[in-house]
Structures are given as structure tokens and as C-alpha cells.
Amino acid sequence: MDPFAIMDCALIAIAIGEKAHNLRELLDRLLRIEDPAVTYFHFWGGLLRPQFVDPEYQNDFAAWAYHDLHDRRLAERLSILNPTEFKSIDDLHRRIIDVVEERMDEDDFDPHTEAEKPFFFMRSQIVIFDTRERAQTPEQLGDIIPSLALGSLFYHLIDARRRTESGRDDFSEWLWGWGAPYAPCAAKIAAIDPYFNSILELRSELERVLKQYLSKGNAS
């Protein structure tokens, strides 16, 4: 097996010059904006942003619906959307549109409601860095995880899902390459849902799984 190359990344937010002051405008922008990097940013970008993210309304659409539009019903419907359950970002984008349209069709929807603050559409651009750190064995990878930079964790555990052919993270992909002894560990890591956790919680969970399975006797 080739060594596991530890990469790091930064998620850069880029304004695209679009905003919405109410739900009708939000729907209009969603129908026009087809760049998957926009949906990606508003669902995943919060994990790397140095700011508070509402744990109940984790994606930007749900948070805006609750805090600025004051539409709790819509916010709850948007908040349960988990990007890992969709085959592609485009599928997720279409589901957001469906949720918004369904809300606007309901009898209690007020089309005149204006948000306290507009929703600003942003797109993501990932800048990748090679840390030049390498894990030669699964055990070495386990030793590296506790000090792994958050950008590295995001790149290998989350962003990898849109890069790998299998749609899995880099850690489990690499461990599966080591054969049957490491398959249970790989499967456990692949089963981690990265969306409804903070990035620090994800690192702790990854560390726990590797410690459990790579301890003496579990991978032999």
C-alpha cells in the first residue's frame, strides 16, 4: 500500500452577487443558480467557519428561515436535510427547491413576509495543501489523528465523498486496501455521519474508532 498522504485545506467563501429578502426571492434564486458549489458551501461550509453555527439549524438555509424569516415550520423541514443521504449535490439542490415550494403552497404562508436580513448566496472554493506528513501503516494513521488539523479532517472525511468513486471518505478507502483484517475498522469509519456533528466531534469519533479497532488483537 502507498502511504496515506495527509492533506490540509481551506474553504474559501466567494460572493456571487445574489441575495434574497423573502421566500419568493429565495425560490427564484434557487431556480436560477445551478452551481453545485453554492449548495455545497451553504450545507458544509459551517464546519470550517470561525463562527457560531446553530446546532439545531445547521445549514444556512434553515438558519435563515428560522432566525431572519421567523418561519419555524420551514426551518425544521430544511434542517433535517442531510447531504450524505443524496446521491449528488444536484439532488440535494432539487430537494431544497421542493421544500420551499411546498411551504409556499400552504394556506398559512404569508407571501408578504420580509426577512430581517437578506440571504446572501455564496459559493465555495477549496484550496488544498500538502502537509508532507505520511502514515505508512494504519497504526501510524491512528497516532496522527488526535493532532490532525481540522482542515485535514474536512478534506479527508467530508470532501473526499465527492472525489472518491465509491463516495466514501479517504480513511476508509485506504484502510480497505489493507485487506480483511482492517475491513471492520474501515466499515465503521465509513458509517460515521459527518453532517450532524461538529468537526471536533468528528475527530474524537474517528480517534475512538481507530483506537478501538487498531489496538492489539483487533486488526490481526
Residue ranges and their predicted role:
Residues 1-63, 72-220:
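Extended alpha-helical surfaces
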